[in-house]
């Protein structure tokens, strides 16, 4: 940094006591810091508001050189710290001339200077500090940081052998080179490294000083310099109002100043700053403020207004009255005491101050009495209510415990008076509740009586049409009563002669009856199942680290993030609606109560005279005297404007109002309205909020369907699984007629013998040595299928010598990996092959056992193993431990024993494990048809609108069906199992090439169709493309190609296409109706009931099914059903967990897999056109992403300025239905605007204002943890 200065202080050489010449510094100015400035640089000064800096040099480059003196962090108050460095002058103001007029204030100035150990006598001429004064000042000064020296050799002068070192940054000479200690430099961000913090580091900080404990406003006081700036503002404002002769404003400013001084006193006590210097200064400060307040009030009361106006307008201070001069002198002393207090508090200025104003705890904002499901609950078994996480950490930290939640805090620290739930009913429980509670035990509403509806209801209401019907039915019941009440109010307004107390009491009674009927609606709003939105927030968190078994690519993450940003506003409006519902109901009750009062203003004295937030700190931008306004009057005027109603006043009330004004009576700004008119307006608001609740419930249901519809149509079963995880009813799968209607995971042991009676009776008639050993551990279902059993029982039934259950065998071999490892499964089979005979058998019984059981079982074992290796073997089943089984030796032993099929078994074993041809031996793992790619024939791409329109829709649909059916035939059962199991049972499955290729093709087709439309700038051509693709989708339906049909529909209902209203208007209505019929077929409501019915009607016809339904069924069946059944013994009530395999779950999976395989058997009898197929394949590559397409959509048809655009993630007609519903219920643009902007109050000119603090809370509840 350059040292060139416009003007600089003089450097006068002086000699010390030893006679050496050392330059002496001369300050040229004294400045006061007005704005905070922090820096990490060692050659710059960090400034706080109120600091005094002695300027040594004013550089031309905009930086000044100065010295800053502060108290040190030691307990000795006389110990000082000297800092020298560069600082920006724009953060300071010169006070050199102001210090001349400081009034006499007794010994405070001498005490202040004595504390500095300096003798500063500032005059009009610059003061030259002698070497002795400078050394005396710096003798006991401790440097805050080790200074960085840059020594520069000086040329030797004649007659002088002394070598001086010069620091260019600080412009200081020295004789010796100070070597810096090799200590690790701590970062400036660590507050513990500051001396300001070290002074109170050993003290126990208050709980409320935690930085992350509350939701804070921007204007909240956090550090000392914030408080100093706020107090100084009110001091200046009070002085200005005094000199301006504005009595009301002066009293308001003085009241606010007194409140801030009270906060200062409370902070000193909370921080335990009990030094004598603090106590004396605070007492003098309060005394001076009291004296100033008394004298100012005497001034305003004893002096007439005109005289005060004349005296205050005098510019010459000497011509003012002695009383005013005395008041101003007292105020100057108050100024000095504040500066002295700031100087004393400098060592603590980086301390986070305790919070004194009321604020919400973080993670605990529950929107008044409503439940907030987005709040992460940290429940403890000893506590009935969840507590704010930050409050738990603060209380635990104050108790010497490091804990993140309630579970890590001992019960003794949580304020619980009992060790178990039953202790509440003990005789000593009442006495325990009388003890002094802690912060945990005194949580409002912690009793059972004050629990919300949420805690009383076990199951939440699902987001479906049934819940919406409940709300609508209840609203219709309330509407009839409400219309009658409005009719009664209208009759009174038309004829006041019918006024009577009985009528008012009757309306009041009907109001309570009406409100009590609202409880079911409140119950539904309080207990809506918002699990899918909770999961969406968790998945949309950028900082979330997903488990290994969760496969989410970049495209999925972008979709989740986009959906979260779109739905956050809807959820925020939903919570605002719930709060508004609460406000309307309360107002409805209060207005009804007013009808029964003779004097409707009897409760007016209970109203607080001060507006809400009167003592709230002001924003930094408002701390300007030029822009400062009267806080009290301004707030009241704002409230009056916001709360101004459109009620028509009663004529009689107006006459009374004017009479009171003429009599100069105090009417306290009361408004005289017709109460019946007010009651009618409240009924209208109540009626509107009921309708609004239906709209929001319907909106949440539609958005939920949109999310699931997108995931299903894009075949993203992993997204569907993650979104629905934890939702009530998740995992329920209706597999058709074969599925059990009432299937529970708990099975009674005395009921598993009721099915399959005939076969079991035959088993009972057999000799004991021929009966199955584990037959009692099998659980049968109502459809004569094995529902569950132990591992031994399942293996025994698999290798049974009498009954061959083909479906059971297939299910077992397909899903065995979810029950056993490969080594364990084959070990069980080998053990079954080597059965031990029962004890106490005679020779004849033994021979019968060998002939009728052992040999048949051995044959069954060999047959099962051969079938397994030949048809159901997958390379991912290979394990290192399989070598220990010696399967080739086992097969050779079976050959020597002449077991049927043993030779073929040996062949399969050698082929799988010795020749290493596992990939070729697995017939299911067949690659895609590569003939087209091998010929390297490149056709013309469908890259233009003309080329796409030139292809006949029938030809396009035919070739598209052939291509997609070929890809569908490459899907194997292992692809499907890998898609749902992932790494759940084994990490060696690998990818699912066939299924991934099929899903990728469908998604590419969707992107190709949407991109082909949005890239076309001409509206008429876009309309032709829309009609063209609709016709292609219709022909795909005729060919039973539901996969391509769904991909086309998804593209046409995507956000970038659906919003093109002008383009859709150019499509003829018949074509749009055709698209709606296709979309109705693939409607996801009721688990794609229309599509499933259409699919069941197909018998032997070829078909390309929509695979998203299968993925959903597989995902729900696997994730929604447990792997094990719990056996409940009816007599003993004993639970034996994880013993009985839930085989019914595996059977359902195989049912779905069989349907997938079924449609691979029948092929289309179409002629393949390789040119068209090649063009289709090549056109699907390198398509821009959905975000790019949406940008193109905005270019061809920009958003209307005053119209709400649909959500970008709407992929079906549910949004169109939402628009229709809103149109039917609204019919007017006024109501639509009120709904979108949330301007709900009919009786007010403005919408209910949501504070900035509440908006910040909503942002926390719906964003990343």
UniProtKB/Swiss-Prot annotation:
<dbReference type="InterPro" id="IPR036964">
    <property type="entry name" value="RASGEF_cat_dom_sf"/>
</dbReference>
<keyword id="KW-0344">Guanine-nucleotide releasing factor</keyword>
<dbReference type="Pfam" id="PF00617">
    <property type="entry name" value="RasGEF"/>
</dbReference>
<dbReference type="InterPro" id="IPR000651">
    <property type="entry name" value="Ras-like_Gua-exchang_fac_N"/>
</dbReference>
<keyword id="KW-0132">Cell division</keyword>
<keyword id="KW-0728">SH3 domain</keyword>
<feature type="compositionally biased region" description="Low complexity">
    <location>
        <begin position="416"/>
        <end position="428"/>
    </location>
</feature>
<dbReference type="InterPro" id="IPR008937">
    <property type="entry name" value="Ras-like_GEF"/>
</dbReference>
<dbReference type="GO" id="GO:0005886">
    <property type="term" value="C:plasma membrane"/>
</dbReference>
<dbReference type="Pfam" id="PF00618">
    <property type="entry name" value="RasGEF_N"/>
</dbReference>
<dbReference type="InterPro" id="IPR001895">
    <property type="entry name" value="RASGEF_cat_dom"/>
</dbReference>
<keyword id="KW-0131">Cell cycle</keyword>
<dbReference type="InterPro" id="IPR019804">
    <property type="entry name" value="Ras_G-nucl-exch_fac_CS"/>
</dbReference>
<feature type="region of interest" description="Disordered">
    <location>
        <begin position="1201"/>
        <end position="1252"/>
    </location>
</feature>
<feature type="compositionally biased region" description="Basic and acidic residues">
    <location>
        <begin position="1214"/>
        <end position="1236"/>
    </location>
</feature>
<dbReference type="InterPro" id="IPR036028">
    <property type="entry name" value="SH3-like_dom_sf"/>
</dbReference>
<feature type="region of interest" description="Disordered">
    <location>
        <begin position="409"/>
        <end position="454"/>
    </location>
</feature>
<feature type="region of interest" description="Disordered">
    <location>
        <begin position="623"/>
        <end position="648"/>
    </location>
</feature>
<dbReference type="GO" id="GO:0005085">
    <property type="term" value="F:guanyl-nucleotide exchange factor activity"/>
</dbReference>
<comment type="function">
    <text>Promotes the exchange of Ras-bound GDP by GTP.</text>
</comment>
<feature type="compositionally biased region" description="Basic residues">
    <location>
        <begin position="1239"/>
        <end position="1252"/>
    </location>
</feature>
<dbReference type="InterPro" id="IPR023578">
    <property type="entry name" value="Ras_GEF_dom_sf"/>
</dbReference>
<dbReference type="GO" id="GO:0051301">
    <property type="term" value="P:cell division"/>
</dbReference>
<dbReference type="InterPro" id="IPR001452">
    <property type="entry name" value="SH3_domain"/>
</dbReference>
<feature type="domain" description="Ras-GEF">
    <location>
        <begin position="952"/>
        <end position="1199"/>
    </location>
</feature>
<dbReference type="GO" id="GO:0007265">
    <property type="term" value="P:Ras protein signal transduction"/>
</dbReference>
<protein>
    <recommendedName>
        <fullName>Guanine nucleotide exchange factor SDC25</fullName>
    </recommendedName>
</protein>
<feature type="domain" description="N-terminal Ras-GEF">
    <location>
        <begin position="782"/>
        <end position="914"/>
    </location>
</feature>
<feature type="domain" description="SH3">
    <location>
        <begin position="26"/>
        <end position="97"/>
    </location>
</feature>
């Amino acid at each position: 940094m350059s040292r060139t200065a416009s003007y600089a202080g003089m450097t006068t050489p002086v000699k010390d006591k030893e006679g050496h010449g050392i330059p002496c510094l001369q300050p040229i100015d004294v400045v006061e810091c007005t704005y905070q400035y922090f820096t990490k640089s060692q050659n710059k000064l960090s400034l706080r508001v109120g600091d005094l800096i002695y300027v040594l040099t004013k550089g031309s480059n905009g930086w000044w050189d100065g010295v800053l003196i502060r108290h040190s962090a030691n307990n000795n108050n006389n110990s000082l710290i000297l800092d020298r460095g560069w600082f920006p002058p724009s953060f300071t103001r010169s006070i050199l001339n102001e210090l001349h007029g400081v009034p006499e204030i007794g010994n405070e100035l001498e005490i202040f200077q004595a504390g500095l150990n300096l003798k500063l006598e500032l005059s009009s001429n610059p003061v030259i500090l002698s070497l002795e004064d400078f050394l005396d000042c710096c003798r006991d000064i401790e440097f805050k940081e080790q200074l960085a020296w840059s020594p520069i050799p000086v040329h030797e002068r004649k007659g002088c052998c002394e070598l001086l070192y010069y620091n260019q940054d600080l412009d200081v000479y020295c004789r010796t080179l100070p070597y810096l200690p090799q200590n690790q430099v701590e970062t400036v961000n660590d507050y513990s490294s500051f001396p300001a913090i070290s002074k109170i580091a050993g003290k126990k900080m208050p709980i409320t000083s935690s930085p992350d404990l509350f939701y804070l406003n921007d204007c909240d006081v956090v550090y000392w310099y914030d408080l100093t700036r706020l107090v100084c503002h009110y001091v200046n404002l009070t002085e200005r109002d005094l000199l301006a002769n504005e009595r009301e404003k002066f009293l308001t400013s003085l009241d606010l100043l007194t409140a801030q001084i009270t906060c200062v006193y409370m902070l000193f006590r909370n921080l335990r700053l009990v030094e004598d210097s603090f106590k004396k200064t605070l007492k003098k400060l309060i005394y001076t403020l009291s004296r100033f307040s008394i004298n100012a009030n005497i001034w305003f009361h004893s002096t007439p207004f005109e005289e005060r106006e004349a005296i205050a307008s005098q510019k010459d201070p000497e011509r003012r009255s002695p009383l005013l001069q005395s008041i101003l002198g007292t105020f100057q002393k108050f100024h000095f005491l504040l500066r002295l207090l700031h100087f004393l508090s400098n060592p603590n200025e980086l301390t986070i101050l305790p919070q004194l104003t009321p604020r919400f705890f973080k993670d605990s904002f529950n929107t008044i009495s409503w439940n907030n499901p987005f709040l992460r609950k940290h429940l403890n078994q000893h506590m009935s209510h969840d507590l704010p996480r930050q409050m738990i950490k603060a209380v635990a930290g104050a108790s010497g415990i490091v804990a993140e939640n309630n579970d890590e805090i001992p019960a003794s620290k949580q304020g619980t008076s009992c060790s178990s739930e039953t202790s509440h009913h003990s005789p000593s429980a009442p006495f325990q509740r009388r003890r002094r509670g802690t912060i945990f035990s005194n949580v409002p509403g912690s009793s059972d009586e004050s629990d919300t509806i949420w805690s009383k209801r076990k199951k939440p209401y699902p987001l479906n049409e049934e819940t919406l019907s409940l709300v609508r039915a209840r609203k219709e019941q309330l509407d009839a009563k409400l219309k009658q009440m409005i009719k009664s109010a209208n009759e009174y307004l038309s004829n006041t002669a019918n006024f009577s107390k009985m009528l008012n009491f009757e309306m009041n009674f009907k109001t309570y009856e009406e409100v009590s009927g609202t409880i079911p609606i409140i119950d539904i709003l309080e207990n809506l199942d918002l699990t899918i939105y909770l999961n969406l927030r968790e998945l949309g968190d950028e900082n979330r680290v997903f488990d290994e078994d969760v496969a989410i690519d970049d495209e999925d993450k972008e979709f989740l993030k986009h959906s979260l940003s779109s739905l956050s506003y809807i959820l925020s409006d939903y919570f605002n609606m719930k709060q508004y519902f609460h406000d309307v109901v309360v107002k409805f009750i209060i207005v009804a109560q007013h009808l029964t009062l003779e004097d409707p203003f009897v409760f007016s004295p209970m109203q607080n005279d001060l507006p809400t937030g009167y003592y709230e700190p002001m924003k930094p931008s408002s701390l300007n005297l030029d822009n400062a306004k009267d806080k009290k009057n301004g707030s009241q005027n704002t409230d009056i404007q916001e709360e101004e109603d459109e009620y028509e006043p009663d004529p009689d009330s107006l006459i009374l109002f004017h009479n009171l004004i003429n009599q100069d009576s105090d009417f306290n700004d009361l408004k005289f309205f017709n109460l019946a008119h007010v009651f009618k307006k409240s009924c209208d608001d109540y009626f509107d909020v009921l309708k609004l609740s239906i709209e929001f419930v319907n909106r949440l249901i539609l958005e939920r369907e949109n999310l699931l519809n997108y995931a299903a149509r894009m075949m993203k079963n992993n997204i569907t699984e993650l979104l629905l995880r934890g939702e009530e009813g998740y995992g329920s799968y209706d597999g058709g007629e074969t599925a059990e209607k009432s299937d529970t995971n708990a099975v009674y042991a005395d009921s598993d013998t009721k099915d399959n009676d005939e076969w079991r009776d035959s088993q009972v008639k057999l000799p004991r040595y021929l009966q199955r050993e584990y037959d009692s551990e099998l659980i049968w279902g109502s459809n004569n299928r094995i529902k569950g059993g132990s591992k031994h029982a399942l293996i025994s039934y698999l290798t049974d010598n009498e009954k061959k259950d083909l479906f059971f065998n297939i299910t077992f071999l397909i899903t065995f990996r979810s029950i056993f490892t490969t080594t364990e499964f084959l070990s069980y089979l080998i053990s079954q092959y080597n059965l031990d005979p029962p004890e106490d058998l005679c020779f004849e019984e033994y021979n019968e056992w060998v002939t009728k059981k052992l040999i048949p079982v051995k044959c069954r074992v060999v047959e099962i193993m051969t079938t397994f290796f030949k048809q159901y073997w997958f390379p991912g089943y290979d394990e290192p431990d399989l070598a220990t089984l010696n399967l080739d030796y086992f097969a050779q032993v079976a050959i020597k024993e002449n077991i049927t099929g043993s030779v073929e078994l040996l062949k399969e074993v050698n082929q799988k494990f010795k020749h290493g041809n596992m990939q070729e031996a697995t017939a299911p793992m067949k690659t895609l048809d590569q003939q087209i790619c091998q010929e390297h024939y490149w056709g013309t791409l469908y890259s233009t609108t003309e080329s796409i329109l030139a292809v006949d829709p029938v030809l396009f649909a035919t070739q598209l069906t052939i291509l997609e059916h070929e890809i569908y035939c490459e899907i194997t059962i292992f692809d499907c199992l890998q898609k749902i199991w992932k790494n759940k049972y084994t990490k060696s499955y690998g990818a699912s090439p066939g299924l991934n290729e099929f899903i990728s093709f469908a998604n590419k087709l969707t992107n190709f169709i949407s991109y082909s439309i949005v890239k076309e700038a001409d509206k008429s051509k876009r309309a032709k493309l829309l009609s063209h693709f609709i016709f292609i989708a219709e022909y795909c339906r005729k060919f039973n190609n539901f996969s391509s049909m769904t991909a086309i529909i998804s593209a046409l209902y995507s956000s970038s296409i659906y919003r093109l209203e002008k383009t859709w208007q150019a499509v003829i209505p018949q074509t749009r109706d055709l698209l709606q019929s296709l979309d109705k077929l693939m409607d996801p409501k009721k688990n794609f009931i229309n599509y499933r019915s259409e699919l069941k009607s197909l018998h032997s016809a070829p078909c390309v099914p929509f695979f998203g339904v299968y993925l959903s069924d597989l995902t729900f069946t696997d994730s929604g059903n447990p792997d094990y059944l719990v056996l409940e013994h009816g007599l003993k009530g004993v639970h034996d967990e994880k013993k009985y395999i839930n085989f019914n779950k595996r059977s359902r999976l195989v049912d779905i897999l069989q349907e997938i395989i079924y449609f691979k058997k029948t092929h289309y009898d179409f002629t393949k056109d390789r040119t068209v197929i090649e063009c289709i394949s090549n056109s699907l590559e390198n398509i821009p992403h959905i975000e790019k397409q949406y940008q193109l959509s905005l270019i061809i048809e920009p958003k209307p300025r005053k119209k709400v655009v649909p959500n970008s993630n709407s992929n079906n007609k549910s949004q169109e239905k939402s628009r229709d519903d809103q149109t039917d219920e609204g019919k007017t643009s006024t109501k639509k605007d009120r709904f979108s902007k949330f301007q709900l109050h009919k009786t007010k000119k403005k919408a209910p204002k949501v504070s900035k603090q509440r908006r910040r809370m909503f942002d926390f509840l719906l964003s990343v943890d």
